[in-house]
Amino acid sequence: MRLTDIEIEQALDNGTIVIEPRPGIEAISGVSVDVRLGGQFRVFKDHTAPYIDLSGPSVEMQAALDRVMSEIIEIPDGEAFFLHPGELALAVTYESVTLPADIVGWLDGRSSLARLGLMVHVTAHRIDPGWQGKIVLEFYNSGKLPLALRPRMTIGALNFERLNHAVARPYNTRKSAKYKDQQEAVASRISQD
């Protein structure tokens, strides 16, 4: 069952769910809690790579990813990152989130932003039980105009579901967890599959 605003507040109060910095009461409504945009981004660099072989040898795949992804781009508070039509960028939430082994989270973009063409979380919107860290956002501008994204703007909302039982392998205890404890806009680690 999805947690209500009352249950979310209780989970934050008793430490079952941890969101740092803790959101104010105005950020919690209905069945969700707002999250804000952090100041770190990554983009695809200009490159001549004809493709990335997603099922090729890990070493070659990682080399291709290293060639095409930028380093972290830091955007100070008050300044903007511009996402142009047809561009993909990685970003990170301002908040860090910790979930117990019996709660799964879901991240949804804001409808008001989607109506301007901004996809906030292209496909991976599940936050696994046992997650700890910031959430990487996969932005895509499907609109017609560049969009100015500023650190700390409200970018999406998290909602939570309590599971019938705790999972046997919470995310942060799995050796295969590629994005464990992430604190920045981490690029794809598909080569580690």
From Swiss-Prot:
What is one Gene Ontology biological process annotated in the Swiss-Prot or TrEMBL record?
A: dUTP biosynthetic process
Q: Transcription: present as a keyword of the record?
A: no
Q: Per UniProt, which keywords does this protein have?
A: Hydrolase, Nucleotide metabolism, Nucleotide-binding
**Class of enzymatic activity (EC top level):** hydrolase
Which reaction equation describes what this protein catalyses? Answer: dCTP + H2O + H(+) = dUTP + NH4(+)
Q: What is its EC number?
A: 3.5.4.13
Q: Name one Pfam family in it.
A: DCD
| Residues noted as binding dCTP in the record, renumbered to the chain | R110, S111, S112, L113, A114, R115, D128, V136, L137, E138, Y171, K178, Q182
Stretches for region Disordered: 174-193
Source organism, top-level taxon:
Bacteria
Q: Does the keyword Nucleotide-binding apply?
A: yes
Metabolic or biological pathway: Pyrimidine metabolism; dUMP biosynthesis; dUMP from dCTP (dUTP route): step 1/2
Which molecular function terms from Gene Ontology are attached?
dCTP deaminase activity; nucleotide binding
Purpose of the protein: Catalyzes the deamination of dCTP to dUTP.
Q: What does the annotation say about its assembly with partners? A: Homotrimer.
Q: What is this protein called?
A: dCTP deaminase
> To which species is this protein native?
Shewanella baltica (strain OS155 / ATCC BAA-1091)
The gene coding this protein: dcd
